[in-house]
């Protein structure tokens, strides 16, 4: 008898599965006999429980297992014989109008869609490029110097003393203060501290607090009002105004290291050569620029492919991906040390839009890769592994680490496939180049 696959919508299908009751009962009887060999019941030795008692106790459970197994197998056979590309898991529901002597179930499921790829030549891509200038190297050196800043008390005697012991605190200084804050005359939790140090201008403190400390000299005090923002992390004081008293105890000025041989050595340049140091910084910036520009271009390519492609997305796959994203979110919370992260009430609905895009993009990429033979070649995978391994002390060990684990290798393969897709689209699409500074590039990718 031919199987009739009903079309319930764009992707939803239904097929009826019939199972002869005598075949089901035969399998149930066989499994119960096997079960009886080991089953335990009070008053009987193992394997000596009467078959009738085993049947009474377990027949319902065994019958459900047999039906589940047979329905699943029958559905698999039907989907294969009818060339059905089933997306996700089917749902089975028993039918009340089954033919006498049969069990009948409706299997409802979705199929993978037909993906209509648009003309890649119509896609428009803006390719971001950047050139590392000497000014960018200088800016990076300034950042590296600030990361190695150390402080000296104003008026300190010695090599770094600045003779400004009576100088008022200004931006960039590290200040040490005592403070007391009150709301309606009462000191609140976290509202007071002694010998509290922070750097003016870093934004660690609220603007009103930094403004009050700026301009004070050692030994001076100041009273001021501070309005906590409505969204302040301390819920007990959010939206309230406190009265603070602050006393300046110490002012230290920032001493940045000179760009010399010792500084170069601190960056890993063994002989302290400044030219080598600048070349090393340039290489690092170029690698980082390449990574960031590739990420921007990849996102543009993926957006363009979605824009020119037509397909319906199976809800079953969206729901599966939503659950994956929920699991990833819980794992992220757990890694951050959030208590009971595994049971965090994260609604899957918040990931629906993201999941739909991911599934849709996955289907489009699969079709594009298949149609244009963009699969990753072994030599491409090895080349990427070798390139990644270069940045480690023992590249051979990193290569071995990759090839010893199929999951890691599969991740690299996926990366290569994406790179093949990007290269393919860029070779066909309308591409315009846009030159930006490294600073603009870093800002753009940070906001993405």
UniProtKB/Swiss-Prot annotation:
GO terms for biological process: 'de novo' cotranslational protein folding; cell division; chaperone-mediated protein folding; protein transport; protein unfolding. Its main location: cytoplasm. Pfam families: FKBP_C (PF00254), Trigger_C (PF05698), Trigger_N (PF05697). This is Trigger factor. The gene is tig. It catalyses: [protein]-peptidylproline (omega=180) = [protein]-peptidylproline (omega=0). Belongs to the FKBP-type PPIase family. Tig subfamily. It is found in: Cytoplasm. GO terms for cellular component: cytoplasm. Residues 172-257 form the PPIase FKBP-type domain. Consists of 3 domains; the N-terminus binds the ribosome, the middle domain has PPIase activity, while the C-terminus has intrinsic chaperone activity on its own. GO terms for molecular function: peptidyl-prolyl cis-trans isomerase activity; protein folding chaperone; ribosome binding. The keyword Isomerase applies. Keywords: Cell cycle, Cell division, Chaperone, Cytoplasm, Isomerase, Rotamase. SUPFAM superfamilies: FKBP-like (SSF54534), Triger factor/SurA peptide-binding domain-like (SSF109998), Trigger factor ribosome-binding domain (SSF102735). Its EC number is 5.2.1.8. HAMAP family: Trigger_factor_Tig. Involved in protein export. Acts as a chaperone by maintaining the newly synthesized protein in an open conformation. Functions as a peptidyl-prolyl cis-trans isomerase.
């Amino acid at each position: 008898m031919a199987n009739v696959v009903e079309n319930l919508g764009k992707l939803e299908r239904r097929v009826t599965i019939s199972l002869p009751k005598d075949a089901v009962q035969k399998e149930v009887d066989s499994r119960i006999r096997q079960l009886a060999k080991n089953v335990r019941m009070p008053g009987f030795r193992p394997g000596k429980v009467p078959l009738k008692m085993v049947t009474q106790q377990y027949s319902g459970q065994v019958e459900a297992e047999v039906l589940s197994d047979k329905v699943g197998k029958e559905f698999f056979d039907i989907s294969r014989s009818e060339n059905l590309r089933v997306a996700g898991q089917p749902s089975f529901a028993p039918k009340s109008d089954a033919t006498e002597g049969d069990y009948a179930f409706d299997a409802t499921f979705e199929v993978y869609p037909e993906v209509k790829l648009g003309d890649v030549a119509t896609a428009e891509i803006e390719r971001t490029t950047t050139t590392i200038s000497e000014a960018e190297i200088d800016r990076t050196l300034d950042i590296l110097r600030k990361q190695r800043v150390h402080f000296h008390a104003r008026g300190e005697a010695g090599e770094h003393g600045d003779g400004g012991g009576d100088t008022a605190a200004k931006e960039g200084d590290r200040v040490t203060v005592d403070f007391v804050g009150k709301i309606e005359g009462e000191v609140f939790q976290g509202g007071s501290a002694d010998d509290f140090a922070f750097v003016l201008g870093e934004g660690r403190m609220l603007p009103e607090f930094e403004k009050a400390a700026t301009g004070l000299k050692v030994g001076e005090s100041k009273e001021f009002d501070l309005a906590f923002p409505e969204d302040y992390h301390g819920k007990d004081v959010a939206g309230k105004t406190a009265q603070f008293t602050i006393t300046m105890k110490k002012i230290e000025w920032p001493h940045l290291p000179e760009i010399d041989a010792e500084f170069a050595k601190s960056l890993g340049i063994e002989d302290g050569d400044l030219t080598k140091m600048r070349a090393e910084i340039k290489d690092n910036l170029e690698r980082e620029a390449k990574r960031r520009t590739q990420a921007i271009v990849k996102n543009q390519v993926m957006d363009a492919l979605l824009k020119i492609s037509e397909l319906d997305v199976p809800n079953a796959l969206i729901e599966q991906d939503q659950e994956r994203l929920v699991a990833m979110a819980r794992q992220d919370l757990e890694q951050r040390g959030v208590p009971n992260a595994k049971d965090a009430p994260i609604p899957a609905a918040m990931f629906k839009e993201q999941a739909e895009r991911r599934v849709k993009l996955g289907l489009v990429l699969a079709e594009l890769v298949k149609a244009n033979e963009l699969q990753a070649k072994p030599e491409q995978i090895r080349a990427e592994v070798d390139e990644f391994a270069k940045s480690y002390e023992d590249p051979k060990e990193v290569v071995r680490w990759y090839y010893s684990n199929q999951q890691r290798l599969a991740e690299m393969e996926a990366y290569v496939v994406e790179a093949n897709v990007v290269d393919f689209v860029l070779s066909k699409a309308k591409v315009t180049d846009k030159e930006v500074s490294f600073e603009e590039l870093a800002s753009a990718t940070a906001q993405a």
